[in-house]
């Protein structure tokens, strides 16, 4: 059977499987993917790999620590001599000649002692291999752990911290840039970096015919590229040209190569003879500011392309770099795009911890070496190693990095990077997942970001193109898509496997040409050659689909550059795709379950990288695949999986404006109050919200079904009517049914914890002069202690309000250190926790519970970005009601839909209405009930006709309209009202937390204006728009009172004659008696001085201008 027959058989098998079967298979395959990897496996896998392998690699990279007593590490020179002996040179004659080789006396290790010592403490990631809660199942929940908790975060000093995945530049490939024209061999180690640059020859005699020359930057020095070729063993110019092997007739390229040869002749005339080129390279390297201690041969062996062994291989790789640069300059090769994910790697907890520990371990080593050096410089003997090694260096360094969020820069040792660690959000389980799947690109906001904020084609299927914050982080902070998977570091060596697939070895010889063979690059290293790249790549992919090669291996065949690039490193974004040519295997065996590992082993699914996907032809779905199966090599599981976890659960998201979906996915879903954990009674969060009666929506999405997580929805199903109601639901306001709220709708509780700690008597860190602070009840002048017991803590159920002492602390002398409830804080004591921390201090936490029912000013939102505040609470008897007696819970304004372009909410209400109502029997059908349409998955939603027919079968209007009666008059309303169930969310923005009221209060000492903090009795933020509103309403007296009298009222003196500012001074008039008052120094009189009332901010501005030498003239009028 030939290839055409095989393809036709595969096409027939795919068509015979049917659309329904394939869609069901895609759903089960996605479910098995989430069961295998979950949503946060990238965080756990990275940390586990660091613990099992990366940590040991860090210590092995430092090698042995050598401490010599004659070396002063502070002065970086030999130390002082204690016992000096003067030697003089004498001549010794011997009658024997030296024959044979030199012999050396090696140092012999007399004693080897091994012992376990504490180097430092490393935080343990929750649910990792080191965590005691890593076990799964009901037993874990019985121990008090949360059933929603998937781990992936750290607990640092009682706060939950999470790593934000960092997008860093890939160092596993050559980097070609056009500004300036360079090709770089990047490495995290500075000495291993190598750059070839094509620049103008500044030493040319005729600047009009100045040609570009090739130079290299190696070990902080600049060397002509032709000299480096000969230093690596190239014997002739022709051999160097053959290594470059530029296949083109561009005159500018030829001139650049000739100019490069001339430049090499200019700096070293006889570089082709002997070792002159190597000598010149040695001279340049040793002339740098910080020359290496190794010889030039060792420098070329250790620092120049350390992945290649042999100078001839290094010369060949240098010729390859030059060819890449010249091809890009001639327009035959594209420059690298820094915004493409093919040129990026995702750094997670393992890589970030490894880099940070390396910095602190180097610090601890230097500190230990200095202490041992000081001990050896004296007469004393060395003490045990733990006496010199300070374990707090690593422990405190990591704690400081977690607390401040500033971590080591990946390429610059002296700089720190912020935004690496953030507090884990706990408003609801969805917010927690979003924080764990977030990525961040580090750029300078002050400079030109370029296209970094814009979506890139490489984001497709790996990064959600809607989930990004607004503001300065827009486009820089992203969220991984549902099926996005971060690759882990491969442990097994694949080089030997590549030889079995047809790869030829790269010989250490520059005289043999490649003869049209293609280069094979493994993680950026040139490992071999292949004669037929097409068959070689086909064999690699076939073996990968049979699990003979790593499943996360990425294989790219570049026909234009004659390269085969293979990647097995960590940090690449992968995603699963259906392999079309292997779908016929599903017909042979149709199990009820599809383990994801089994699908990968069978080659039905494979993990595709970004570069490999460039050669794939992917169908957008099963429907598109079945139309033309021959045209596609791969197929998507579902288009909704291209979105992030917060976007994929939005119903009818493809019908809404993108901005509204962004608001829901990035703001509202993270601010929605839900049920954040199953163990709230044992947690001591600073602030948490819990919804009393959370519900799941009536509709379903494919993502929520595959994830099997109903807790991703945080809200309740409300009957929503689209109508105007007494004008109270204009401008983002909604009207709610008061009776529904009294029945418990959207009722929640807020739990706030207050924490305090005290030192124990045996605490080492407490200063000796400080008094010991202990918990206890004492008479307090700052607040009331009526609810406190003798131990200083309130009793359970105590009703506490503003001014009460919540935790009593005092010293032996009676000094009060208690914690008082601030302004607007109140609640009922729910629990009191007393424990101790790792630092030996006792700490206490008191949690206050407060029930919050919706009130005016609270914020609500649907899942379509339709946000609004509660503007009016209407009695149920005054609400409009339908013929069946249904009274809506919420009434929103119809003008909210055209401007915000959210027809998806109307479709959701119509679909939910058809789901909630009973389905009538279909005439002429044997089935008792027709099949319900429940799915509202983005990009595969049911059509409008299907939704309207479902409503019609249920006995309702096709378009969801209802005939209603006026609740106030009982008359039937003329117009029909659209009504249906809609999933609404209550957000954390509540008026009780934001309302401000004050007459006068604390002011800023400089501007004398009210402070901003609400808990400090601060004022409200009053801007130009608020001022314009009061002016439009004619409330000038209120405006004058609020902005002047109760804010920063002040006065200043003006001279009406010269119109300048008059100071209040103390002077002695002709009468001889000292007086103090306003006086105009310009007019030398106080006769025309008047007093005016101005805000102190205006007066301060005038005084600052006066100090700058700017004089102001004031016109005054009598009022």
From Swiss-Prot:
Zn(2+) binds at residues 1055, 1058, 1080, 1083. It comes from the Eukaryota. Its EC number is 2.7.7.6. It is found in: Nucleus. Signal peptide: none annotated. A zinc finger (C4-type) spans 1055-1083. Component of the RNA polymerase IVa and IVb (Pol IV) complexes. DNA-dependent RNA polymerase catalyzes the transcription of DNA into RNA using the four ribonucleoside triphosphates as substrates. Second largest component of RNA polymerase IVa and IVb which mediate short-interfering RNAs (siRNA) accumulation and subsequent RNA-directed DNA methylation-dependent (RdDM) silencing of endogenous repeated sequences, including transposable largest subunit. Also required for full erasure of methylation elements. Required for intercellular RNA interference (RNAi) leading to systemic post-transcriptional gene silencing. Belongs to the RNA polymerase beta chain family. This is DNA-directed RNA polymerase D subunit 2b.
């Amino acid at each position: 059977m030939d290839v055409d027959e095989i393809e036709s058989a595969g096409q027939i098998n795919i068509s015979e499987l049917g659309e329904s079967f394939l869609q069901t298979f895609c759903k089960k395959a996605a479910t098995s993917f989430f069961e295998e990897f979950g949503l946060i496996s990238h965080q756990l896998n990275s940390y586990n790999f660091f613990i099992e392998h990366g940590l040991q690699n860090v210590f092995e990279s430092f090698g042995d620590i050598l401490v010599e007593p004659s070396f002063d590490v502070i002065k970086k020179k030999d130390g002082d001599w204690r016992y000096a002996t003067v030697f003089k040179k004498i001549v010794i004659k011997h009658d024997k000649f030296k024959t044979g080789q030199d012999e050396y006396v090696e140092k012999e290790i007399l004693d080897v002692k091994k012992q376990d010592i504490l180097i430092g403490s490393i935080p343990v990631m929750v649910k990792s291999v080191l965590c005691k809660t890593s076990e799964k199942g009901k037993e874990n929940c019985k121990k008090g752990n949360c059933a929603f908790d998937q781990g992936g975060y750290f607990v640092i000093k009682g706060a939950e911290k999470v790593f934000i995945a960092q997008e860093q530049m890939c160092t596993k490939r050559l980097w070609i840039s056009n500004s300036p024209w360079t090709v770089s061999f990047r490495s995290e180690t500075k000495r291993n970096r190598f750059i070839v640059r094509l620049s103008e020859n500044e030493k040319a005699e005729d600047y009009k015919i100045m040609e570009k020359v090739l130079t290299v930057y190696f070990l902080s020095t600049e060397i002509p590229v032709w000299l480096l070729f000969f230093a690596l063993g190239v014997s002739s110019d022709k051999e160097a040209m053959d290594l470059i092997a530029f296949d083109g007739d561009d005159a500018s390229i030829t001139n650049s190569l000739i100019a490069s040869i001339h430049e090499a002749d200019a700096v070293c005339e006889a570089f082709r003879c002997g070792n002159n080129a190597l000598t010149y390279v040695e001279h340049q390297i040793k002339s740098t500011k910080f020359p290496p201690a190794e010889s030039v041969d060792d420098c070329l062996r250790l620092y120049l392309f350390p992945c290649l062994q042999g100078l001839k291989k290094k010369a060949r790789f240098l010729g390859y770099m030059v060819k890449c640069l010249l091809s890009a300059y001639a327009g035959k090769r594209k420059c690298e795009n820094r915004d493409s994910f093919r040129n990026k790697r995702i750094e997670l907890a393992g890589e970030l911890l490894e880099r940070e520990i390396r910095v602190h371990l180097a610090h601890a080593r230097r500190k230990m070496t200095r202490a041992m050096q000081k001990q050896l410089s004296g007469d004393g003997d060395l003490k045990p190693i733990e006496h010199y090694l300070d374990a707090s260096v690593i422990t405190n360094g990591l704690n400081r990095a977690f607390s401040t969020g500033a971590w080591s820069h990946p390429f610059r040792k002296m700089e720190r990077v912020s935004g690496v660690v953030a507090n884990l959000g706990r408003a609801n389980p969805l917010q927690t997942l979003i924080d764990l799947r977030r990525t961040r690109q580090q750029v300078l906001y002050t400079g030109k970001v370029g296209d970094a904020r814009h979506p890139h084609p490489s984001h497709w299927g790996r990064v959600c193109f809607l989930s990004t914050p607004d503001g300065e982080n827009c486009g820089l902070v992203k969220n991984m898509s549902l099926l996005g998977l971060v690759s882990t570091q491969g442990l097994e060596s694949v080089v030997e496997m590549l030889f079995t697939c047809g790869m030829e070895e790269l010989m250490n010889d520059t005289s043999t040409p490649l003869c049209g063979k293609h280069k094979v690059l493994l993680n950026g290293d040139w490992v071999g050659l292949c004669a037929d790249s097409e068959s070689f790549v086909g064999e690699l992919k076939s073996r990968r689909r049979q699990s003979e090669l790593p499943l996360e291996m990425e294989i790219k065949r570049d026909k234009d550059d004659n390269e085969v690039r293979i990647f097995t490193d960590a940090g690449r974004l992968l995603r699963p795709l259906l392999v079309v040519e292997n779908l016929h295997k599903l017909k042979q065996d149709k199990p009820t379950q599809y383990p994801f590992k089994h699908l990968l082993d069978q080659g039905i699914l494979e993990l595709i990288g970004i570069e490999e996907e460039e050669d794939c032809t992917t169908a957008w779905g099963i429907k598109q695949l079945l139309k033309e199966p021959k045209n596609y090599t791969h197929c998507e599981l579902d288009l909704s999986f291209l979105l992030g976890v917060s976007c994929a659960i939005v119903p009818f998201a493809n019908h809404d404006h993108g901005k509204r979906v962004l608001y829901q996915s990035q703001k509202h879903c993270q601010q929605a109050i839900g049920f954040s954990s199953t163990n709230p009674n044992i947690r001591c969060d600073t602030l948490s919200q819990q919804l009393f009666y959370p519900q799941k929506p009536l509709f379903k999405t494919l993502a929520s079904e595959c994830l099997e997580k109903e807790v991703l929805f945080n809200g309740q199903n409300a009957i929503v009517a689209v109508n105007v109601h007494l004008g109270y639901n204009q401008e983002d306001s909604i009207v709610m049914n008061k009776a529904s709220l009294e029945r418990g709708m959207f009722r929640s509780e807020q739990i706030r914890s207050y924490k305090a700690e005290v030192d124990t008597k045996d605490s080492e860190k407490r200063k000796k002069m400080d008094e010991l602070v202990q918990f206890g009840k004492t008479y307090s002048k700052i607040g009331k202690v009526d609810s406190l017991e003798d131990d200083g803590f309130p009793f359970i159920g105590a009703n506490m309000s503003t001014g009460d002492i919540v935790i009593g602390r005092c010293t032996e002398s009676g000094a009060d250190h208690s914690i008082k409830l601030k302004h607007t804080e109140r609640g009922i004591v729910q629990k009191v926790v007393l424990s101790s921390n790792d630092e030996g201090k006792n700490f206490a936490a008191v949690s206050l519970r407060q029930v919050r029912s919706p009130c005016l000013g609270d914020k609500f939102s649907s899942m379509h970005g339709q946000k609004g505040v509660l503007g009016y609470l209407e009695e149920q008897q005054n609400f409009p009601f339908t013929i069946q007696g249904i009274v809506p819970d919420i009434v929103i304004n119809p003008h909210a839909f055209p401007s915000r372009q959210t027809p998806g909410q109307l479709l959701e209400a119509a679909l939910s209405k058809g789901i909630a109502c009973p389905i009538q029997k279909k005439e002429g059908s044997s089935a008792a009930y027709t099949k319900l349409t429940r799915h509202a998955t983005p990009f595969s939603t049911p059509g409008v006709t299907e939704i309207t027919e479902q409503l019609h079968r249920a006995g309702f209007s096709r378009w969801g309209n209802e005939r209603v009666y006026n609740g106030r008059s009982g008359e039937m309303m003329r117009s029909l009202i659209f009504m249906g169930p809609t999933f609404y969310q209550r957000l954390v923005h509540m008026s009780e937390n934001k309302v401000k009221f004050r007459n006068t209060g604390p002011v800023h000492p400089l501007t004398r204006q009210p402070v901003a903090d609400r808990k400090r009795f601060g004022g409200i933020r009053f801007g130009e728009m608020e001022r314009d509103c009061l002016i439009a309403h004619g409330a000038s007296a209120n405006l004058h009172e609020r902005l002047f009298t109760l804010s920063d009222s002040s006065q200043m003196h003006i001279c009406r004659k010269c119109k300048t500012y008059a100071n209040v001074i103390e002077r002695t008039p002709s009468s001889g008696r000292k007086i103090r008052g306003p006086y105009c120094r310009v007019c030398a009189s106080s006769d025309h001085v008047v007093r005016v009332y101005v805000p102190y901010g205006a007066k301060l501005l005038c005084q600052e201008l006066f100090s700058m030498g700017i004089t102001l003239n004031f016109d005054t009028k009598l009022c």
